[in-house]
């Protein structure tokens, strides 16, 4: 018996200026919810899965219908409450309150593990929201691209004289997050071999111009990589295979590998393909015996990470890109799993101390010309930032839009609100055809507690203190964000993180300008405060220089 076709599919966000909802403040979350499920963005839209294994935009199709229905009728003095992808209430609030408040995947500590989460998910009581899937601000692979670009640029600065030209990177995973890796490396002038077990993902990354070529074998991939490296020519190479098998083989070839990382879905062992399991049998095998499958996956991750550590022993720069593969490998029996660092303490924390982090926006008009106009505005606002200029220029030339046209760049405390206010002015003046939504990843300087990623190795040992993520959600709600979310388990998996997100709508009104100024000042301000409190001197300098009040420093 065949499953009947879902009449809702395919889903595309509306373009243009005609409203379905009662105002732009509610039209925006409606369009962004739909944009998350656009087939250009979503990995499995038929299952409401956007990215990251099982990261969903809504809990069920019935819940999706109720979300759409409620957003179209919601007033500007009302707030919709969303509990793990399902609308559970509408409250009368006020125009400064968020139109949507979202809580996804949150569990009490002793119950915060994958087994209990899956039991509750099977009962229809929760869903996995990842970071931007359940908070409706996913913009495709570009959403992680600049962060990945910045990370590889930091690697280049640290080890390779400011460029990756003449280097070879080996990594794995070309999904919604990992798919940014090949372009991020080539934007830094390097060569990269990307291992992926799903042929469709390789094809998609080539179609979207994130990946240059596919090699038919490891030997062919190595030959292409060495040739490009010797010519100091950027090149990204996709290789169909299982990383737990390919990386040990790379060790045997003794190819001089310079950089190693990974972005497979290791955060959830059911979405890491074990050695010996055919790709075609993956789904059936994990559903038939999740406990046994998890054990096999962890054993394969142990082999994968062992190869990474041995490449580090040979001199490669190796780092965890925030998917918990080290912890899973340790559970799989490999004791040296944590001998290489996570990317945040290794490269990104100095940026966090300045309140820098991912600042993204999408054009509700659907017109790429609106993004081109905002690109120009960003360059005019920050003419002295050479790395930003390089990024915006290359992104305009090379980044494929997925769904609504969007852009991302990293901005710091004292910068984000200037960009938001400029965009709002451009909407008001008619320079932009429709409003802009402004949000970010939950991976930010002051919005997450994640001891295996963003808060790994904090100076004061506060890696697991989650108060900061809660305060971030509260301050963004108090400051006037259009929608605010608080999630558990994004990026690194259930039991390992708590994190918050916010989105503002620049609709050209004076009220929007007031909200934007507060939110886009206070949100990155939380990053400065969090790092001052942890004892980082640079954060304390930024606080003094830019007027961030720290009561414990005022006595």
UniProtKB/Swiss-Prot annotation:
GO BP field: L-histidine catabolic process to glutamate and formamide; L-histidine catabolic process to glutamate and formate
EC number: 4.2.1.49
Gene Ontology cellular component list: cytoplasm
Function as written in the Swiss-Prot or TrEMBL entry: Catalyzes the conversion of urocanate to 4-imidazolone-5-propionate.
Functional pathway: Amino-acid degradation; L-histidine degradation into L-glutamate; N-formimidoyl-L-glutamate from L-histidine: step 2/3
CC cofactor note: Binds 1 NAD(+) per subunit.
Subcellular location: Cytoplasm
Chain residues that bind NAD(+): 52-53, 130, 176-178, 196, 201, 242-243, 263-267, 272-273, 321, 491
GO molecular function: urocanate hydratase activity
Superkingdom of the organism of origin: Bacteria
Catalytic function, reaction form: 4-imidazolone-5-propanoate = trans-urocanate + H2O
Protein name, per record: Urocanate hydratase
SUPFAM superfamilies assigned: Urocanase
Gene3D superfamilies according to UniProt: Urocanase like domains (3.40.50.10730), Urocanase superfamily (3.40.1770.10)
Organism, as annotated: Nocardioides sp. (strain ATCC BAA-499 / JS614)
Cofactor: NAD(+)
Active site: residue positions: 409
């Amino acid at each position: 018996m065949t499953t009947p076709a879902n009449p809702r599919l395919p889903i595309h966000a509306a373009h243009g200026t005609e409203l379905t909802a009662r105002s732009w403040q509610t039209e925006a979350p409606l369009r962004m919810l739909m944009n998350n499920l656009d087939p250009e963005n979503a990995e499995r839209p038929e299952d409401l899965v956007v990215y990251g294994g099982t990261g969903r935009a809504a809990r069920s199709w019935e819940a999706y219908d109720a979300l759409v229905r409620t957003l179209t009728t919601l007033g500007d003095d009302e707030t919709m409450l969303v509990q793990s992808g399902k609308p559970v209430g509408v409250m009368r609030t006020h125009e400064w309150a968020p139109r949507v408040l979202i809580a996804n995947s949150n569990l009490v500590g002793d119950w915060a593990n994958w087994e209990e989460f899956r039991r509750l998910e099977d009962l229809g009581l929760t869903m996995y929201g990842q970071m931007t899937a359940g908070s409706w601000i996913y913009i495709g692979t570009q959403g992680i691209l600049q962060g990945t670009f910045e990370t590889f640029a930091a690697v280049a600065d640290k080890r390779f004289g400011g460029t990756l030209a003449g280097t070879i990177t080996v990594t794995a995973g070309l999904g919604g997050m990992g798919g940014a890796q090949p372009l991020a490396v080539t934007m830094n002038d390097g060569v990269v071999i990307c291992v992926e077990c799903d042929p469709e993902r390789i094809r998609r990354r080539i179609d979207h111009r994130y990946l240059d070529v596919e090699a038919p074998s490891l030997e062919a991939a190595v030959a292409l990589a060495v040739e490009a490296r010797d010519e100091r020519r950027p090149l990204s190479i996709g290789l169909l295979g299982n990383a737990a098998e390919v990386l040990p083989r790379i060790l045997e070839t003794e190819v001089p590998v310079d950089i190693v990382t990974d972005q497979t879905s290791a955060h959830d062992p059911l979405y890491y393909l074990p050695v010996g399991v055919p790709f075609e049998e993956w789904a059936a095998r994990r559903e038939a015996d999740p406990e046994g499958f998890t054990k096999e996956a962890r054993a394969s991750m142990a082999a994968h990470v062992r190869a990474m550590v041995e490449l580090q022993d040979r001199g490669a720069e190796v780092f965890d890109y925030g998917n918990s593969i080290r912890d899973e490998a340790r559970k799989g029996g490999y004791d040296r799993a944590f001998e290489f660092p996570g990317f945040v303490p290794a490269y990104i924390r100095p940026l966090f101390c300045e309140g820098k982090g991912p600042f993204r926006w999408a054009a509700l008009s659907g017109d790429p010309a609106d993004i081109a106009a905002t690109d120009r505005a960003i360059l005019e606002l920050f003419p002295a930032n050479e790395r930003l200029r390089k990024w915006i220029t290359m992104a305009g030339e090379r980044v494929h839009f997925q769904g609504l046209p969007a852009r991302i760049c990293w901005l710091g405390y004292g910068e984000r609100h200037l960009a938001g206010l400029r965009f709002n002015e451009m909407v008001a003046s008619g320079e932009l055809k429709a409003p802009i939504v402004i949000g970010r990843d939950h991976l930010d300087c002051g919005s997450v507690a994640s001891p295996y990623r963003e808060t790994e190795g904090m100076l004061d040992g506060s890696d697991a203190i989650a108060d900061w993520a809660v305060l971030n959600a509260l301050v963004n709600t108090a400051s006037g964000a259009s929608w605010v979310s608080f999630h558990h388990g994004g990026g690194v998996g259930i039991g390992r993180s708590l994190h918050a997100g916010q989105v503002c709508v620049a609709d050209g009104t004076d009220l929007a300008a007031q909200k934007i100024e507060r939110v886009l000042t206070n949100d990155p301000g939380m990053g400065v405060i969090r790092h001052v409190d942890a004892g980082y001197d640079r954060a304390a300098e930024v606080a003094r220089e830019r007027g961030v009040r720290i009561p414990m420093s005022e006595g």
